[in-house]
Design a protein with these regions (language model features):
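N-terminal Rossmann-like NAD(P)+-binding subdomain of aldehyde/semialdehyde dehydrogenases
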Residues: 1-131
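A structured beta-alpha segment of the ubiquitous adenosine-cofactor-binding alpha/beta core
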Residues: 132-133, 200-218
Length: 295
């Protein structure tokens, strides 16, 4: 059983308490995960805040280079990360319709590379004899990321890479059900980034609540349930924290009269049961035109 640690200011940090992470296929204990305290969250946020002034003025080209390097480093550990993802989350390597751990790993690398190529150009909203008005998008500061268990690595990358690319520093808290792949990924990423730019703390929902209330976190990014998103919104309002909430969807499919039902049915089935149906984008409603309803 591997040892896992928090990563704060580029260093591995042990905790007094741990919690068990289970293999959902066998319900056996897969690992003991560090349980961060409120004080350790404060340390992680303080490290991110110390790193922010330097990281925020790092050349745009250098941040882009580092994101490409991160993708390469994660790719070099792709087999290890994919196996760990299967063990803690339960999805097989290939998965239903080919959308298993291997797909998530591939998406992780692609997202790193794609984000590296994004830019934040100056937007000119007025340029005439009266005035020239430009919009410059500047880094916010410390971003808190709270991620779910259904796509633990991919969604972590969705949160973290745009934040880093735009000059912010990050404290991430993965789901307590699937923290191991994210812990290992952050460890790998920290071999490339300056200390404090990316920190990770692990624990239960109380740690996420503390992040939402933390006065030195400038923005919260959360993917998860609508009830939890409502709580985060309420907490963040207390200190005018910016938020991005990706909550549960209610996706629909529409089958029109001229549809080739035999061809469409397997795709509809796959869309409903991708990742065992445990995804915000899974098909939940199906509308079929009355002319082909019986078919």
């Amino acid at each position: 059983m591997s040892d896992y640690h928090l990563i704060i200011d580029g260093q591995k940090v042990a905790t007094e308490e741990t919690f068990a992470v289970l293999n959902p296929a066998t319900e056996e204990v897969l690992a003991q995960c560090p349980k961060a305290t409120a004080e350790q969250l404060d340390q992680a946020v303080a490290a991110a805040r110390r790193a922010f002034p330097s990281w925020s003025v790092t050349a745009d080209s250098e941040r882009a280079r580092l994101l490409h390097a991160i993708a390469d480093a994660l790719g070099a550990h792709g087999e290890e990360l994919s196996k760990l993802l299967t063990l803690e989350q339960g999805k097989p390597m290939g998965g239903f319709a080919g959308l298993g751990a291997g797909f998530e790993m591939g998406g992780t690398l692609a997202w790193c590379h794609a984000t590296a190529e994004l830019g934040l150009p100056v937007e000119v909203v007025q340029d005439n004899d009266e005035a020239r008005i430009e919009v410059h998008r500047k880094p916010l500061g410390v971003v808190g990321s709270i991620t779910p268990w259904n796509y633990p690595l991919l969604i972590a990358i969705w949160h973290v890479m745009p934040a880093l690319r735009s000059g912010n520093t990050v404290v991430i808290k993965p789901s307590e059900y699937t923290p191991l792949t994210t812990l290992r990924a952050v460890e790998i990423i920290n071999e490339l980034l300056p200390p404090g730019v990316l920190n990770i703390v692990t624990g239960d929902g109380s740690l996420g609540a503390a992040m939402s209330n933390h006065p030195d976190i400038n923005k919260i990014v959360f993917t998860g349930s609508t009830p939890t998103g409502k709580k985060i919104r309420q907490s963040a309002a207390g200190n005018l924290k910016r938020i991005t909430l990706e909550l549960g969807g209610n996706d629909a499919a529409i089958v029109l009269p001229d549809t080739d039902v035999a061809a469409a049915a397997p795709k509809i089935f796959a869309t409903a049961l991708i990742n065992n149906g445990q995804t915000c984008a899974a098909l939940k409603r199906l509308y079929v035109h009355e002319d082909i309803y019986e078919e």
